[in-house]
UniProtKB/Swiss-Prot annotation:
The presence of a 'disulfide through disulfide knot' structurally defines this protein as a knottin. Expressed by the venom gland. This is U7-ctenitoxin-Pn1a. The lineage of its organism: Eukaryota, Metazoa, Ecdysozoa, Arthropoda, Chelicerata. One of its GO terms (molecular function) is toxin activity. Residues 1-17 form the signal peptide.
Length: 84
Protein backbone atom coordinates (compact mmCIF):
# COMPACT_ATOMS: atom_id res chain seq x y z
CA UNK A 1 0.00 0.00 0.00
CA UNK A 2 2.84 2.40 0.88
CA UNK A 3 4.54 1.57 -2.40
CA UNK A 4 1.35 2.37 -4.32
CA UNK A 5 1.02 5.76 -2.59
CA UNK A 6 4.69 6.49 -3.29
CA UNK A 7 4.22 5.69 -6.99
CA UNK A 8 1.16 7.96 -7.22
CA UNK A 9 3.05 10.84 -5.58
CA UNK A 10 5.99 10.27 -7.94
CA UNK A 11 3.68 10.26 -10.96
CA UNK A 12 2.04 13.53 -9.87
CA UNK A 13 5.46 15.12 -9.37
CA UNK A 14 6.64 14.06 -12.84
CA UNK A 15 3.45 15.34 -14.51
CA UNK A 16 3.70 18.73 -12.79
CA UNK A 17 7.39 19.05 -13.68
CA UNK A 18 6.58 18.24 -17.31
CA UNK A 19 3.90 20.96 -17.39
CA UNK A 20 6.42 23.52 -16.09
CA UNK A 21 8.99 22.47 -18.69
CA UNK A 22 6.47 22.76 -21.52
CA UNK A 23 5.32 26.17 -20.27
CA UNK A 24 8.92 27.44 -20.17
CA UNK A 25 9.55 26.15 -23.70
CA UNK A 26 6.41 27.90 -24.94
CA UNK A 27 7.61 31.18 -23.42
CA UNK A 28 10.97 30.77 -25.20
CA UNK A 29 9.39 30.00 -28.59
CA UNK A 30 6.54 32.53 -28.59
CA UNK A 31 8.65 35.67 -29.33
CA UNK A 32 9.86 34.09 -32.58
CA UNK A 33 6.31 33.21 -33.59
CA UNK A 34 5.04 36.69 -32.70
CA UNK A 35 7.85 38.31 -34.70
CA UNK A 36 7.07 36.18 -37.76
CA UNK A 37 3.31 36.85 -37.65
CA UNK A 38 3.79 40.59 -37.01
CA UNK A 39 6.01 40.80 -40.06
CA UNK A 40 3.60 38.78 -42.18
CA UNK A 41 4.58 36.82 -45.24
CA UNK A 42 5.08 37.55 -48.91
CA UNK A 43 2.17 36.61 -51.16
CA UNK A 44 2.05 34.92 -54.54
CA UNK A 45 3.83 36.72 -57.40
CA UNK A 46 5.31 39.30 -55.00
CA UNK A 47 9.05 39.97 -54.91
CA UNK A 48 11.05 37.96 -52.38
CA UNK A 49 14.48 39.18 -53.50
CA UNK A 50 15.42 40.48 -50.05
CA UNK A 51 13.71 37.77 -47.97
CA UNK A 52 14.01 34.43 -49.74
CA UNK A 53 12.41 32.53 -46.84
CA UNK A 54 9.49 34.93 -46.37
CA UNK A 55 6.94 33.48 -48.80
CA UNK A 56 3.55 32.38 -47.48
CA UNK A 57 2.92 28.65 -47.50
CA UNK A 58 2.70 26.81 -49.99
CA UNK A 59 4.72 29.27 -52.08
CA UNK A 60 8.51 29.37 -52.23
CA UNK A 61 10.95 31.95 -53.54
CA UNK A 62 12.08 31.36 -57.14
CA UNK A 63 14.89 33.50 -58.55
CA UNK A 64 16.21 33.86 -62.10
CA UNK A 65 18.14 36.12 -64.48
CA UNK A 66 16.63 37.51 -67.65
CA UNK A 67 18.67 36.82 -70.78
CA UNK A 68 21.23 39.49 -71.53
CA UNK A 69 21.01 40.98 -68.02
CA UNK A 70 24.00 41.07 -65.65
CA UNK A 71 24.16 38.36 -62.96
CA UNK A 72 23.65 40.98 -60.26
CA UNK A 73 20.22 41.79 -61.76
CA UNK A 74 18.26 38.88 -60.27
CA UNK A 75 14.46 38.64 -60.24
CA UNK A 76 12.74 36.75 -57.43
CA UNK A 77 9.07 36.10 -56.71
CA UNK A 78 6.95 33.76 -54.63
CA UNK A 79 5.51 30.92 -56.70
CA UNK A 80 4.68 27.23 -56.52
CA UNK A 81 7.64 25.01 -57.23
CA UNK A 82 6.66 21.99 -59.27
CA UNK A 83 9.13 19.13 -59.35
CA UNK A 84 12.48 19.79 -57.70
Amino acid sequence: MKLCILLVVLLITVVRAEEDILENEAEDISPAIKERSARGCIGRNESCKFDRHGCCWPWSCSCWNKEGQPESDVWCECSLKIGK
